[in-house]
């Protein structure tokens, strides 16, 4: 009797430990995965693409797909949501093959992994809102396919042709030009544009409310600015800031990502337009580099500010050309100090070009 009681208590303890471990694991999920939409109707953007895919699924006429567009715009999420709508949860693993071509980019992956998966046929029961039937094909999701070699892409083209009866392919990439025309012509193409801010805000506010975070209005604006239409960046930056600070504000967001704030950049632009070259160098080094900011990030923000300046086109061209050359030089490993001097020189050239039309380039009253 005592042995049975002890065994029961031990079993209960194991169950409690398992439950606790499962809860902890779920709470430790990155928010970008925790709040990833699982159904097509949960997506916040690309309404026309969702409607088209839903129609394909309902009619069981899904073609080969080619999703392209900037990172964080919902390409992978969309195809995974479509897969969940086609296949039951217990059969997803056997019916869907997801590969990241940036890790496995050679021809061997096509010849071995993909071909072995495509050779076996399977019938999978699935359900939609209106009917129940079978899907007589598997799904291969090839993410970041623009990293594949040309030989691998040509081999993939032959596999797509050979196994069309058994498999549907979804090719995902950032740059359409990196995909060989032979694959493009065999797929239905969908372009995923950067998300509009008004579509990001409801999802952002939902996460803030669910996680019980404190977020200021300027903090929300900062998240939208740094994301540039990338939902993944919004969520990852929000989580990082929330883990590091009590309040998500403009200062804490920029501090978390290690980039200069708009206020700091405005001071830099004023310095570049009004101060002597030596003072420019000293001021920028003090304000930016001592705070650990990278010159590459400074160039990116300068580019945004330059287009707000009311200066002649010739002067604008001189600045943009100079910044472009600096960015290229930085990518090849040139020193920050030398390239900072080149940035100062570009602004001084712009001032020289417009000195006849504008005696003073003060921007105290300019709004950014």
Curated annotation (Swiss-Prot):
SUPFAM superfamilies: P-loop containing nucleoside triphosphate hydrolases, post-AAA+ oligomerization domain-like. Its main location: nucleus. CDD domains: AAA, HLD_clamp_RFC. Keywords: ATP-binding, DNA replication, Nucleotide-binding, Nucleus. The keyword Nucleus applies. It is found in: Nucleus. The keyword Nucleus applies. It comes from the Eukaryota. GO terms for molecular function: ATP binding; ATP hydrolysis activity; DNA binding. GO terms for cellular component: DNA replication factor C complex; nucleus. GO terms for biological process: DNA repair; DNA-templated DNA replication. Gene3D superfamilies: 1.10.8.60, 1.20.272.10, P-loop containing nucleotide triphosphate hydrolases. ATP binds at residues 69-76. PANTHER family: REPLICATION FACTOR C / DNA POLYMERASE III GAMMA-TAU SUBUNIT (PTHR11669), REPLICATION FACTOR C SUBUNIT 5 (PTHR11669:SF9). Heteropentamer of various rfc subunits that forms a complex (RFC) with PCNA in the presence of ATP. The elongation of primed DNA templates by DNA polymerase delta and epsilon requires the action of the accessory proteins proliferating cell nuclear antigen (PCNA) and activator 1. Belongs to the activator 1 small subunits family. This is Probable replication factor C subunit 5.
């Amino acid at each position: 009797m005592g042995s049975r009681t002890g065994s029961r208590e031990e079993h209960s303890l194991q169950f409690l430990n398992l439950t606790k471990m499962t809860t902890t694991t779920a709470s430790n999920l990155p928010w970008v995965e925790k709040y990833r939409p699982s159904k097509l109707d949960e997506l916040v953007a690309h309404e026309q693409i969702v409607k088209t895919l839903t129609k394909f699924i309902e009619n069981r006429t899904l073609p080969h797909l080619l999703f392209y567009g900037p990172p964080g715009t919902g390409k992978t999420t969309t195809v995974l949501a479509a897969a969940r709508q086609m296949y039951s949860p217990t059969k997803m693993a056997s019916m869907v093959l997801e590969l990241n071509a940036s890790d496995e980019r050679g021809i061997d992956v096509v010849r071995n992994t993909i071909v072995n998966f495509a050779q076996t046929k399977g019938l999978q029961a699935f359900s939609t809102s209106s009917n129940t039937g079978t899907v007589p094909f598997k799904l291969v999701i090839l993410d970041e396919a623009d990293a594949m070699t040309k030989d691998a892409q040509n081999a993939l083209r032959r596999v797509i042709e050979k196994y069309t009866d058994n498999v549907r392919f979804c090719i995902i990439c950032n740059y359409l030009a990196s995909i060989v025309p032979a694959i493009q012509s065999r797929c239905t193409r969908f372009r995923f544009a950067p998300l509009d801010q008004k579509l990001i805000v409801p999802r952002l506010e939902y996460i803030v409310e669910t996680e019980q975070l404190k977020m200021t209005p300027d903090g929300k604006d900062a998240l939208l600015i740094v994301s540039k239409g990338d939902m993944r960046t919004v969520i990852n930056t929000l989580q990082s800031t929330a883990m590091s600070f009590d309040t998500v504000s403009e200062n804490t967001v920029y501090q978390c990502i290690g980039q200069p704030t708009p206020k700091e950049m405005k001071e830099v632009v004023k310095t570049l337009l009004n101060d002597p070259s030596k003072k420019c160098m000293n001021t920028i080094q003090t304000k930016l580099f001592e705070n650990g900011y990278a010159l590459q990030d400074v160039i990116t923000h300068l580019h945004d500010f330059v287009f707000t300046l009311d200066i002649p086109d010739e002067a604008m061209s001189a600045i943009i050309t100079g910044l472009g050359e600096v960015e290229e030089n930085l990518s090849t490993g040139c020193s920050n100090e030398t390239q900072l001097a080149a940035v100062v020189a570009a602004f001084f050239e712009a001032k020289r070009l417009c000195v006849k039309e504008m005696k003073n380039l003060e921007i105290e009253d300019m709004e950014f």
